[in-house]
A protein has these predicted regions:
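Short, Gly/Pro- and small/polar-rich lid/capping loops
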Residues: 1-40
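Conserved beta-strand/loop scaffold segments within soluble protein domains that form the structured core
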Residues: 27, 35-157, 161
Length: 164
């Protein structure tokens, strides 16, 4: 278990409602680096090899599990760009808790650009929660720039007009 400093713990309490712990499926990114992560039986997290970020694989047997992937920036002048891709298999039931908190007590801009892409299988139930938070007594900006892309299979019932 990684020992977290008071700033990181305080920011995590806000963006994850005091629920983050280093158990189950999780990945904590701090100041541009993944500092700890864990897998569960049905959720596996792999570090990307071609760009910053992670791939999260959620198998179809996942039933009511949660995965936490918070980011904390506490250095002034830091820019963090991350690509997180979620692969949710058919029939999975999962809660994904993301979010970023910036503590900036300096005079330079601190920025997090988080790009999340979801590939959702048939009959999967995904609850996605994302919180963003900025604090600090410095004059530097706290910029949070999330992007969310979702790819899924949709089934629509034929309308009366389509049925003839």
């Amino acid at each position: 278990m990684v020992k977290l400093d008071n700033v990181t713990e305080g920011v995590l309490d806000v963006i994850n409602d005091n629920k983050f712990s280093q158990t189950g499926a999780f990945n904590l990114r701090e100041n541009g680096t993944s500092i700890c992560h864990g897998d569960s039986e049905h959720i596996k997290i792999k570090k990307k090899t071609d760009k910053p970020g992670i791939d999260i694989y959620i198998d179809g047997k996942t039933d009511g599990e949660a995965v936490y992937i918070p980011v904390v920036l506490s250095k002034s002048g830091m820019t963090d760009l991350v690509y997180n891709d979620f692969y949710v298999e058919d029939g999975a039931d999962v809660r994904i808790v993301a979010g970023c908190g910036i503590h900036n007590s300096g005079c330079n801009e601190s920025r997090h650009d988080g790009i999340h892409t979801f590939h959702v299988g048939k009959n999967a139930n995904v609850r996605y929660e994302e919180k963003h938070y900025g604090e600090g007594n410095g004059t530097g900006a706290r910029v949070l720039n999330p992007v969310t892309n979702i790819f899924c299979l949709l089934y629509t019932s034929p309308s009366p007009r389509d049925r003839g």
